[in-house]
Design a protein with these regions (language model features):
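Low-complexity, charge- and small-residue-enriched intrinsically disordered regions
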Residues: 130-135, 413-415, 480-482, 532-541
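A short, amphipathic edge element
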Residues: 45-49, 419
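N-terminal post-signal-peptidase region of extra-cytosolic proteins
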Residues: 84-91
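Gram-negative outer-membrane assembly/targeting C-terminal domains
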Residues: 502-541
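Small-residue helix/turn framework positions
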Residues: 24, 55, 59-84, 101-124, ...
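N-terminal type II signal-anchor transmembrane helix
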Residues: 1-44, 517-520
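Intrinsically disordered, low-complexity linkers and terminal tails enriched in Pro/Gly
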Residues: 127-144
Length: 541
């Protein structure tokens, strides 16, 4: 037994000596030019690595620094900078034949800068394109015949920006990417994860490849994508100036043939805000969508976008164009018979401000809105209609007290305003909102028709005619044969004011004088106090 033990001990000792001695006997820095040349040839970019060291136990060569140049059309700064690069090698060929056969690559703690120019071209588009590597042969632009069993990026930082510098770069931390059986000429599995701006998470699991030899960004992809707690304000999905904010979860798929990308899935948003002066919605919003995106043209088609807010359902279809710094859209929003109770908590997100202390209750809302133009100058036109609803906590009758004084009719009581129907044509633009052909029927009061505007600061400027119920006689003649009283609506949406339009009343008074004063005399007799209000002297008592 003892001789066997001694032999084993000697073998172990020799192995230990070899493990310790070989790194000193082999100067792996001699292979640095070969490693740099191999990586530069594969990527089509100049690659530099730092001091090399050999680890027998892990079977790898480690560089204490890695730098990959950017496309000079984008930046003179490195595209990738990393503190460490581990290159897995076959030890036997390296030790006995001094041949460097790479089996796997691990890039640790890299900082990667992703840039997009005004034409939608990315700085990584030329990765792998031999024509972009001055040190490579200029006679061929075909992809390099490179295969790596394992390619990993660990704890990376990706910075997403544009060459114009108009937007603040977006940073994605803790990026991990795992690729197996990588090849430029075939499909390979990819698993990736990242921490999103604002603390959310991203996971991608799928397949990519073969690498497009002309434009890497057009490489085919099939993947499942999951996002959790995406911060819409801090993401790069929309321009921050648009005021979109909230948190979103996404579960869906992404597929691309290198020409057309197709995305489908479900987006669930909470605390959603859609305009700069809006406030977070009190209800979650779910969007089930399908779209197709032309990767070269930077345009797309939204074939489905079903927006659910509680039991309310609206549908969006249309197209978009992402060329340039601002995305333009041409969409149609259609919703029929949507419960107002489910929509009410969404109004703040749209910047809709109701009178202080009030809220919409009951009834249904229908609408059809077409939106056209760049997102920062979007113009939306269409119509809205609401039926059998109520504005709780707001008594319109009491606000019309000045108008009621003309009629001698007491203002309606109660704390709510019941709305039988409300319809209007709508135009929304950055300079404000305009309502035309406004028609509101309120059983306790009558009806209101007219038009007006709401400024970006929510100031009201409406000219309407109040057709108050139970009013006729002389007042009918004053209104030109109808029972309407001209009313000016001012103030703000949170505190509206309603006053008789004295200019219109004066115009009608002049018409009465032109008729010999006959109609005006009848009016002032039938409507107590109206003569004094219009400046007509009362007859001697």
């Amino acid at each position: 037994v003892k001789p066997v033990t001694k032999i084993i001990a000697i073998v172990v000792a020799v192995l230990i000596v070899l493990i310790v001695a070989i790194p000193f006997l082999i100067n792996v820095n001699n292979y640095r030019p070969q490693i740099e040349s191999s990586l530069s040839s594969a990527l089509g970019r100049p690659v530099k690595v730092g001091n090399l060291s050999l680890s027998i136990l892990s079977g790898s060569v480690q560089a204490d620094q890695l730098s990959i140049a950017d496309d000079p059309k984008f930046s003179n700064s490195p595209f990738v900078q990393a503190k460490s690069l581990k290159v897995g090698v076959e030890l036997m060929p390296l030790i006995f034949g001094k041949q460097l056969n790479i089996t796997h690559l691990t890039i640790e703690h890299p900082e990667i800068a992703l840039l997009r120019d005004r034409n939608g071209v990315w700085n990584f588009s030329s990765i792998g394109n031999q024509s972009g590597n001055q040190s490579a042969s200029k006679s061929s632009s075909s992809p390099a015949n490179v295969s790596v069993a394992k390619l990993d990026i660990t704890d990376g930082t990706f910075t997403l920006g544009s060459t114009t510098g108009k937007r603040k770069p977006v940073v994605y931390d803790k990026v991990d990417v795992s690729v197996r059986n990588f090849s430029f000429t075939s499909s390979f599995p990819v698993v990736a994860s990242a921490q999103l701006p604002g603390g959310g998470s991203l996971k991608i699991d799928g397949n990519a490849g073969p690498i497009n030899s002309t434009d890497t960004s057009l490489t085919p992809v099939q993947a499942k994508v999951t996002m959790s707690k995406l911060d819409l304000a801090q993401s790069a999905l929309v321009d921050p100036e648009l005021g979109v904010a909230g948190s979103a979860d996404f579960d869906g798929t992404l597929g691309s043939d290198g020409r057309i990308a197709k995305a489908a899935g479900t987006l669930k948003a909470t605390s959603l805000k859609l305009v700069p002066k809006g406030s977070p919605a009190g209800v979650p919003v779910k969007v089930v969508f399908t779209l197709e995106h032309d990767l070269k043209a930077e345009t797309g088609k939204i074939s489905q976008a079903d927006v659910s807010i509680g039991k309310a359902l609206a549908k969006i279809t249309g197209t978009y164009d992402m060329q340039g710094e601002t995305t333009s859209i041409r969409t149609k929003l259609d919703g029929q018979g949507m419960p107002v109770d489910d929509l009410e908590a969404m109004l703040p997100a749209l910047g809709v401000v109701l009178p202080t202390g009030s809220k919409l209750k009951g009834g249904t809302l229908s609408l059809s809105i077409d939106s056209n133009g760049p997102l920062d100058k979007l113009v939306s036109t269409g119509w809205v209609k609401m039926n059998n609803a109520a504005l709780a906590g707001f008594n319109l009758g009491s606000k019309l007290s000045a108008v009621s004084a003309l009629t001698g009719k007491a203002p309606s009581s109660g704390n709510d305003t019941v709305i039988e129907t409300l319809s209007s044509n709508v135009r929304y633009a950055p300079d404000g909102t305009r309502l035309d052909q406004l028609n509101v029927v309120i059983p306790s009061i009558g009806s209101v028709t007219g038009s007006g505007t709401i400024s970006p600061s929510n100031a009201l400027d409406f000219k309407v005619v109040a057709n108050l119920s139970g009013i006729g006689g002389g007042l009918t003649k004053l209104a030109g044969g109808g029972s309407g009283i001209p009313v000016a609506i001012g103030g703000t949406t949170s505190n509206p004011t309603f006053t008789p339009d004295m200019k219109s009343l004066a115009t009608n008074q002049l018409k009465g004088l032109a008729n010999g004063g006959k109609d005006l005399g009848n009016v002032t007799k039938s409507v107590p106090g109206l003569g004094g209000l219009l400046g007509k002297k009362k007859p001697n008592q």
